[in-house]
């Protein structure tokens, strides 16, 4: 019997589910899972999450002020959802540091440590957790210190090579370049309805980063994220990991035909690529020169921060905090 495209893809790439929805995770048997404030916000509106919220609320009452309580409530809720997900997958779950700490090295480190401590209280070791940090200069510095502590990092909101190199030099466990959001920007900028899959700017960006990392033997893994169609996903077959929403997992599951491996570390090693020197000045200048990466990074931080605030507001209203 012919394998569907999802099963074929699983043989060449680690498949990660991009959701906070526990029912969807049960359905697709991924290795890992990623969450973010936006996904948690949509998930907690479902009745199944009520006990996780109730438990987080009671836990947060040990905090001294209403500000500390809401912060602890949010962290505990993220960890509770993460623990439920970990019951269903063999691998790791990614839990995000508050996007409002994207330019705060110490704040990011402290938040990561407190999330890891909450997981430990639940009997989950840090090896099964990836801490998500925005791929700012400061995010990379925080990741460098966290990785030295044995806390593994997933660098998110990544749109450019300078961000990728900075994160790899920080020895982050993995990066999550956002394929679909790059496509969105170029479609609007170039005023076109779309691109052929191989010419998709998001696909080309991840492919270039993949070649660079494999050429120079960086240990940091690449997890393509934020897809707009299944063709983008198939163009990155062979990437270390791909994090895919339930909708596209279903499309791939229902699709037949041969999946060709597009990315191969051994082939990337043979390419003639010049190394790029990266320090803070070079990073900031290169990011500033890249209008797409600058705009998408800023927008991503704003949107994740906005959803964290919405979640806080919902919890404050529901539980009458402060």
From Swiss-Prot:
Its EC number is 2.2.1.2. One of its GO terms (cellular component) is cytoplasm. Pfam families: TAL_FSA (PF00923). Its main location: cytoplasm. Keywords: Cytoplasm, Pentose shunt, Schiff base, Transferase. Pathway: Carbohydrate degradation; pentose phosphate pathway; D-glyceraldehyde 3-phosphate and beta-D-fructose 6-phosphate from D-ribose 5-phosphate and D-xylulose 5-phosphate (non-oxidative stage): step 2/3. The keyword Transferase applies. CDD domains: Transaldolase_TalAB. Homodimer. This is Transaldolase. The gene is tal.
């Amino acid at each position: 019997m012919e394998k569907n495209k999802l099963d074929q893809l699983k043989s060449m790439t680690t498949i990660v589910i991009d959701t906070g929805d526990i029912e969807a995770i049960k359905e697709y048997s991924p290795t890992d899972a990623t969450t973010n404030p936006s996904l948690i916000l949509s998930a907690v509106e479902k009745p199944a999450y009520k006990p996780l919220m109730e438990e987080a609320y009671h836990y947060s009452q040990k905090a001294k002020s209403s500000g500390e309580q809401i912060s602890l409530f949010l962290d505990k809720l993220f960890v509770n959802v993460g623990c439920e997900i970990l019951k269903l997958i063999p691998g790791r779950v990614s839990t995000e540091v508050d996007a409002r700490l994207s330019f705060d090295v110490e704040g990011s480190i402290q938040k990561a440590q407190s999330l890891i401590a909450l997981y430990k209280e639940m009997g989950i070791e840090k090896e099964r957790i990836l801490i998500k940090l925005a791929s700012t200069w400061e995010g990379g510095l925080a990741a460098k210190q966290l990785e030295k502590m044995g806390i593994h990092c997933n660098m998110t909101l990544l749109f450019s090579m300078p961000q990728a190199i900075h994160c790899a030099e920080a020895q982050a466990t993995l990066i999550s370049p956002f394929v679909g959001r790059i496509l969105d920007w170029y479609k609007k900028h170039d005023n076109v309805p779309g691109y052929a899959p191989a010419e998709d700017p998001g696909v080309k960006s991840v492919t270039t980063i993949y070649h660079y990392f494999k050429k120079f033997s960086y240990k940091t893994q690449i997890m393509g994220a934020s897809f707009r169609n299944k063709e983008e996903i198939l163009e990155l077959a062979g990437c270390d990991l791909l994090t895919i929403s339930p909708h596209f997992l279903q499309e791939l599951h229902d699709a037949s035909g041969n999946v060709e491996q597009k990315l191969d570390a051994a082939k990337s090693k043979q390419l003639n690529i010049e190394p790029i020197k990266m320090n803070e000045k070079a990073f900031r200048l290169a990011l500033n020169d890249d209008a797409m990466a600058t705009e998408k990074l800023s927008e991503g931080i704003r949107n994740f921060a906005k959803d964290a605030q919405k979640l806080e507001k919902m919890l404050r209203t529901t539980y009458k905090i402060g």
